[in-house]
Every structure is written in structure tokens, then in C-alpha cells.
């Protein structure tokens, strides 16, 4: 079965790269539409997939269609292609705030609809994607979607009511992690370390720590305690972070992001 993407920006490119690396699809089984010939040329050169400037061609030639345009263009695109959509199609939205009900309504007929929220680490094969689907999507079809998202990271199926939480803890949080890495590196530079080297130490520390959580199954608090020797330097750093509201700031940032996302539901 062929697969289609309407739009092929950074996220779609990351998704397609993962599928190709995992061998889920061949290059000639993936068709993408771009707004310009320049964009089509980039997609062909970077990914080697079939390209077109016509969104209708994507829908006519595939049964699994990913909407990979910016959120503000979703309605325009769906209005353009809805006459070509059939009950055999599955439409997948990857934008925050576009609910399953809204997507199905804009498709103009009862259809299989999926929402997913990938994040930018998908670009290096370490994405985290939350997925939900309407009742028309079978378990087998949902498993196929999850196989695709697993090709560029990890996947969790969640009820739609949790998609804002997914967006906050997974979609938004890379920005906060990058801020933390930058702050750690700044501190190392203040201690005399060259900046490039400081970024390596800070980023690898976060990468390794995250892998410990995922691969050991241990509670993050337990892993933290393993590093904190009595009266040592690490527990002193923990004390200062707590004194300055580190945990509370993270909590409020994620809650604030989720609340903001809830305001754009349509």
C-alpha cells in the first residue's frame, strides 16, 4: 500500500526518513506534495520519494494520507481534497488542537481519522509520539500507524483527552530541555571549559540520564538518590535547585503549555 504526505517540511521529512531506514516502505511507495517546485526538488534529492505539486494526486494514489502542512492550512487543504476521499482512506493529522471530530467534519464524510503528536527529536530517530484514533480505525490499522511512528522513536496510544498533555510533556518539552542544556553549558564555561566541549558534556549527561530511566525501569527519584552522596556536591546542587523552585517551574511550564493548547481546540 502506498502512503502519502500533503506537505513535506522538517517533521514529514523526519517521519519519511525513519520509515525508509526501517524498510517499512520503498521510496516509490511514498508520494509527497509540495507547494513549490523547489520544495519538490528538495524532497526528491533528500528522500528520493515520488513528488507532486498536486494534493489531489496524493489522495488519489494512496489510502493513508498524512496532513503535514501548518495548522492554519488544514481546513483549506481538506476542503480542496475532500471530494477524492473515500471510506477506505485514513487521514492522519499531526497538528496540535485539531480534534478527531473536527478532522472528520472537514473531510466531509465519516472517515477513519487519526491524530498524532510527534516531536522534533524524530529528526534524529528519537522522537516520542502520542497517537489516538476514532472508532472507525481498526486495531490492525492503528498498529500500522504505530509501526510507522516507532520507526522514528517511541509511541504511546492515548485517549484523545490526553493529547494536550502529550503535546506539553513531549511536543513542547524539547525546548525546555535545550534551555537546560544551554544553562548547564554556561555554568561549565564559567568554570573555564570551552563552549563546544561544554555542550558535549551537558547534552550527553541528559541523553545518558534519559536512557537510564527508559532502560532500567527505575523511578527517577531513585536514580537521583544514587548520585547524591551524603554531604556531597550533588545533593548540595539539588538543594539549590529546590530552593530556587526548579521542580515547581517545570511543573508550571508544562501546565501552562497544556492550558494554552486547550484554548486552540477546534
Regions found by a protein language model. Name each.
Residues 15-16, 81, 184:
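Hydrophobic residues within alpha-helices
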Residues 37, 46-47, 55-60, 64-131, ...:
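Rossmann-like NAD(P)(H) cofactor-binding subdomain of soluble oxidoreductases
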Residues 102-112, 128-165, 178-215:
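Internal alpha-helical scaffold of NAD(P)-dependent oxidoreductase catalytic cores
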